[in-house]
Amino acid sequence: MFSFTSVIALLSAGIVASASPTAIEERSLTSSSTGYSGGYYYSFWTDGSGNVVYNNGNAGEYSVTWSGNAGNFVAGKGWNPGSERSVTYSGSFNPNGNGYLSVYGWMTNPLVEYYIVESYGTYNPGSSATHKGTVTSDGGTYDIYVDQRVNAPSIQGTATFNQYWSIRQQKRVGGTVTTANHFNAWQKAGLQLGSFSDGAYMIVATEGYQSSGSSDITVH
């Protein structure tokens, strides 16, 4: 990514998919879709300029492969609506270049986009955001950041909203993320939280931007 602002503009575009999931469970996808698979909500968005294939597996498993060093996608499984839950996941995440593995989602009233980043590729998404402290949770330390998006895509259409980030210093793929610890730490840092309503989903997301790689994640 060339800059934090341009990166987030592209990443934020990934959440424009409808908050109302389709009734049909789809397995292998190459175009944007939301729905339910194996009892979990899934969201897959791609800008169409790279080569990306998303697959819904059994229960909470999904996989995604991408190539071509072009484009942006966001994909994963989780819950709609989200909640203060302990998220346990396992699997593999192998980006060649820029990519994120995170617990990702939205809050409303106020509108907030959030990331709890477990691992990333060549670009740390907190590089150009405002650092607000740290939080220790689930055996690791996370740096807290805040940024604002102005007239950007969201689950409520074009809007101005804050982004909250927790980025793990010790990268890992697999474990439990106690989301309440992050939400509480954000509040203590002066960041106003919203509610889990009006399509405010939560997924364990794989994201890629102008890169290649593979990811196979199971949400438990």
UniProtKB/Swiss-Prot annotation:
<dbReference type="GO" id="GO:0031176">
    <property type="term" value="F:endo-1,4-beta-xylanase activity"/>
</dbReference>
<dbReference type="InterPro" id="IPR033119">
    <property type="entry name" value="GH11_AS_2"/>
</dbReference>
<dbReference type="InterPro" id="IPR001137">
    <property type="entry name" value="Glyco_hydro_11"/>
</dbReference>
<dbReference type="InterPro" id="IPR013320">
    <property type="entry name" value="ConA-like_dom_sf"/>
</dbReference>
<keyword id="KW-0624">Polysaccharide degradation</keyword>
<feature type="active site" description="Proton donor">
    <location>
        <position position="207"/>
    </location>
</feature>
<comment type="similarity">
    <text>Belongs to the glycosyl hydrolase 11 (cellulase G) family.</text>
</comment>
<keyword id="KW-0326">Glycosidase</keyword>
<dbReference type="InterPro" id="IPR033123">
    <property type="entry name" value="GH11_dom"/>
</dbReference>
<comment type="pathway">
    <text>Glycan degradation; xylan degradation.</text>
</comment>
<keyword id="KW-0378">Hydrolase</keyword>
<keyword id="KW-0732">Signal</keyword>
<dbReference type="Pfam" id="PF00457">
    <property type="entry name" value="Glyco_hydro_11"/>
</dbReference>
<comment type="function">
    <text>Endo-1,4-beta-xylanase involved in the hydrolysis of xylan, a major structural heterogeneous polysaccharide found in plant biomass representing the second most abundant polysaccharide in the biosphere, after cellulose. Efficiently hydrolyzes different xylans including beechwood xylan, birchwood xylan, or oat spelt xylanand; as well as xylo-oligosaccharides (XOS) except xylobiose. Xylotriose, xylobiose, and some longer XOS were the main hydrolytic products. Xyn also partially degrades xylotriose to xylobiose and xylose, and the longer XOS (X4 to X6) are also efficiently hydrolyzed.</text>
</comment>
<protein>
    <recommendedName>
        <fullName>Endo-1,4-beta-xylanase 3</fullName>
        <ecNumber>3.2.1.8</ecNumber>
    </recommendedName>
</protein>
<dbReference type="GO" id="GO:0045493">
    <property type="term" value="P:xylan catabolic process"/>
</dbReference>
<feature type="active site" description="Nucleophile">
    <location>
        <position position="113"/>
    </location>
</feature>
<feature type="domain" description="GH11">
    <location>
        <begin position="28"/>
        <end position="220"/>
    </location>
</feature>
<keyword id="KW-0964">Secreted</keyword>
<dbReference type="InterPro" id="IPR013319">
    <property type="entry name" value="GH11/12"/>
</dbReference>
<feature type="signal peptide">
    <location>
        <begin position="1"/>
        <end position="19"/>
    </location>
</feature>
<keyword id="KW-0858">Xylan degradation</keyword>
<keyword id="KW-0119">Carbohydrate metabolism</keyword>
<dbReference type="InterPro" id="IPR018208">
    <property type="entry name" value="GH11_AS_1"/>
</dbReference>
<dbReference type="GO" id="GO:0005576">
    <property type="term" value="C:extracellular region"/>
</dbReference>
